């Protein structure tokens, strides 16, 4: 909340950021298969994301915020080579080669620094990377692989939120759309479980989210310690409801993290 009050713009502002990445690998992309090899020199370049942001103040208390994300150049037909099944034949798949997504679109009512309200499409602050997903907030070229494999990233859902500051604590409480169990996989847990395959999002069983940060460690100015909590009953949000009819499997996520930024920067 303190960040929103300190933003300083009077009416509207534009912003954004982007990432360009280059990687070098000394192994084949399919090195774990019999056809692959663990010894191959190759390099890649990509534009993982480009974000455009816009904020508008209807009044000092009502603020509209939006972000549009372009991933890997936007949407298009992805082409793949069927190396084994079809002897290298090229196919045009009905897949998205990249993505254009409305990452944020919400209205905030700034009542005071302690209690504020938000309505719309917003970031789900579960885990360090989702809560602080801008490129300057992680050390590597890419976002931390462990967290972005197990959890959606960037995770954004539609709902309502309360947020504010209480002394050295800042908090956010959300009720947002839940996950689709059809996206759960053994190899990436709930990382692919966000809804979005259809125009409408199921809200039968919403998710409950809480995040708290503490910034009052006196011996280490610049240290922030945080924790987040997520609870959802995703069976009613299934994109294949007959398959999950009558099933109940609650999903609970608890995370803890810390981040240090030098006060001299």
Model features per residue range: what roles?
Residues 189-238:
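Loop-centered beta-sheet repeat module
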Residues 163-200, 224-226, 248-249, 255-260:
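Glycine/serine-rich loop-strand microenvironments at binding/catalytic pocket rims
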């Amino acid at each position: 909340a303190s960040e929103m009050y300190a933003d300083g713009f009077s009416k509207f502002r534009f912003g954004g950021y982007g990432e360009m990445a280059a990687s070098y690998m000394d192994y084949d992309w399919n090195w774990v298969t019999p056809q692959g090899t663990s010894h191959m020199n190759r390099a890649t370049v990509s534009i993982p994301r480009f974000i455009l942001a816009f904020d508008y103040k209807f009044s000092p208390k009502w603020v509209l915020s939006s972000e549009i994300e372009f991933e890997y150049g936007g949407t298009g037909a992805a082409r793949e080579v069927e190396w084994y099944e079809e002897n290298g034949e090229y196919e045009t798949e009905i897949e998205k080669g990249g993505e254009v997504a409305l990452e944020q679109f919400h209205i905030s009512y700034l009542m005071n620094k302690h209690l504020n309200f938000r309505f719309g499409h917003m970031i789900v602050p579960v885990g360090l990377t989702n809560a602080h997903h801008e490129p300057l907030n992680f050390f590597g070229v890419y976002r931390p692989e462990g967290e972005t494999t197990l959890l959606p990233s960037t995770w954004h859902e539609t709902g309502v939120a309360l947020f504010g500051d209480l002394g050295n604590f800042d908090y956010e409480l959300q009720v947002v759309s839940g996950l689709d169990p059809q996206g759960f996989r053994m190899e990436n847990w709930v990382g692919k479980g966000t809804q979005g395959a259809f125009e409408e999002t199921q809200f039968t069983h919403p998710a409950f989210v809480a995040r708290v940060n503490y910034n009052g460690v006196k011996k280490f100015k610049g240290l922030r310690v945080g924790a987040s909590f997520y609870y959802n009953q995703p069976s009613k949000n299934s994109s294949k409801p007959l398959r999950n009819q009558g099933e109940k499997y609650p999903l609970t996520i608890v995370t803890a993290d810390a981040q240090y930024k030098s006060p001299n920067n």
